[in-house]
UniProtKB/Swiss-Prot annotation:
Its main location: secreted. Residues 34-155 form the C-type lectin domain. Disulfide bonds join 27-38, 55-154, 129-146. This is C-type lectin 1. It comes from Hydrophis hardwickii. GO terms for molecular function: carbohydrate binding; metal ion binding. InterPro entries: C-type_lectin-like, C-type_lectin-like/link_sf, C-type_lectin/snaclec_domain, C-type_lectin_CS, CTDL_fold. It is found in: Secreted.
Amino acid sequence: MGRFLFASLGLLVVAFSLSGTGANLYCPFDWLSYNVSCYKLFYSLVTWDQAQRFCVEQQENSQLASIHDVGESVKLSNYISQRWGFFDVWMGLRLSKRNGIWEWSDGSNLTYTSWKEGEPNNLFNMEFCAVLSAGTRYLQWNDKKCTLLHPFLCQFQPRSEANG
C-alpha cells in the first residue's frame, strides 16, 4: 500500500509540473510553445493591419499576440530579445475607434497591461496600435501610429496531443 501511495504521489507531482508548460502541445517546428499557445516572431517590416492579416493566414486561429500576465510577458520578452533588438514589435492590441477602449485582436479580455510610463498617450490623436518596446527589452508597451513599419509577433492555440 505504501509503495502504491508513493508511486501515485510521484505521478501526481509530475502531472502538475507538466501542466501549463505546453508539454502536450504541437507547435510547429520554429514556433515558441508557452502555456497553451504557440508564438512566432516575424521579421518583415509591415503595418499593424498587414501584420494581423499575415498572422491570420499562418495557422488556424492565429492572430497578433495577446499578453495576459507578467509570466507570459517575461517569456515573450526573452524570446524576442534573443532574436531581435532593433525595432519595436507589433502585438495584437489596438484602440477601438468605435468605443475608445484598447482591445486584443483575438477578442480576449484586456486583463493585464504593461504600458511604459506616460503611455498610452495617443500622440496627435494618431496612435491606435500597440508595440512591445525595444527600449524596454520588450517588457513594456507603447502606442504607435498603425501605419508605421515594424516586425510582429503571431500567436495561436494548437490542438493538444489528445485532440490532434
